Design a protein with these regions (language model features):
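Accessory terminal alpha-helical modules
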Residues: 3-274
Length: 274
């Protein structure tokens, strides 16, 4: 500021700068579990476009999830990158700028396809937890619901691995449907994972999926076929509504539950399902 004033001799005396003062009650500051740092962006978020998930970067669950996930070596020798704070992947990547082959070194360790954020985690987890309607409400609302269930907990290695594997199946199915030019694949993926989890969620060999670090075709192919049938069923019955809006209604969930779509074969013969 001093340097600026030395170079600029204009009169700035009449310039007004808006200032927001947030007053926090002493009782609130002294209450158990109050995180002062986490409350600053929440109090300041009146005009800026800050997303709900951005305000939870300091929640201990996500801090520990990030720490564990960054330390888990995969069978491929690379790592998953959980983006606890928006833009952290690029920020970490930029640290390698200037180094010889720096960006390649970073992306070899943390491949772009193995980066996911808090909303990805939330939407996927809700579907596996049999809450597809919540997942279909949008990334931020889905995150708020997921956050309520985890913000007071600390994840362990087993939970982190399982949630990453769930995201791996979720995102791989979505990518497969996109490759086949399916419209609004996320909605169909939400309900496909819901149906799959409803029957097999507690029987999947997550340690096998983690070791493989990809979705085996014996699961991905029938899951893709399930998604196609589900897509047809929903579109035939949604009337004039947009599929992403219809998917938020009880009517859609009831329709999916009533749909006569067999899940027995070939899932029952897969070595990844016990």
């Amino acid at each position: 500021m001093e340097n600026f004033l030395e170079k600029n001799k204009d009169n700035f005396a009449k310039i007004q700068v808006p200032l927001k003062i947030v007053r926090i009650k002493k009782s609130t500051l002294e209450s158990d579990g109050f995180d002062f740092a986490a409350q600053i962006p929440i109090a300041a978020n009146t005009q800026n476009a800050i997303k709900a998930s951005d305000l939870s970067a300091s929640v201990k669950y996500y801090q520990e999830f990030e720490k564990i996930s960054r330390e888990l070596t995969t069978s491929n020798g690379d790592y998953w990158f959980f983006e606890r704070a928006r833009g952290s992947y690029k920020a970490e990547e930029d640290k390698f700028i200037g180094q010889r082959k720096g960006k390649n070194i970073f992306r070899t360790k943390y491949p772009k396809e193995k980066m996911f954020d808090k909303t990805d985690l939330a939407v996927s987890a809700l579907c596996w937890d049999l809450k597809p309607m919540s997942a279909c409400k949008g990334a931020q609302l889905a995150f708020l619901e997921f956050n309520e269930g985890v913000k007071e907990r600390i994840p362990d290695v087993k939970e982190v691995k399982e949630l990453i594997c769930k995201w791996l199946i979720f995102s791989t199915l979505e990518r497969r449907l996109k490759e086949e030019n399916r419209k609004n694949p996320r909605t169909i993926v939400n309900y496909s994972i819901y149906l799959f989890s409803k029957k097999y969620g507690n029987r999947i060999e997550w340690s096998e999926i983690w070791s493989l670090q990809k979705v085996p075709e014996e699961i991905l192919y029938p899951l893709t076929e399930l998604a196609k049938k589900l897509d047809q069923t929903i579109r035939r019955n949604m009337g004039n509504e947009m599929i992403n809006m219809f998917a938020r209604k009880d009517q859609c969930l009831e329709l999916v539950d009533r749909a006569e779509i067999s899940l027995d074969h070939p899932f029952e013969t897969s070595r990844y399902i016990r």
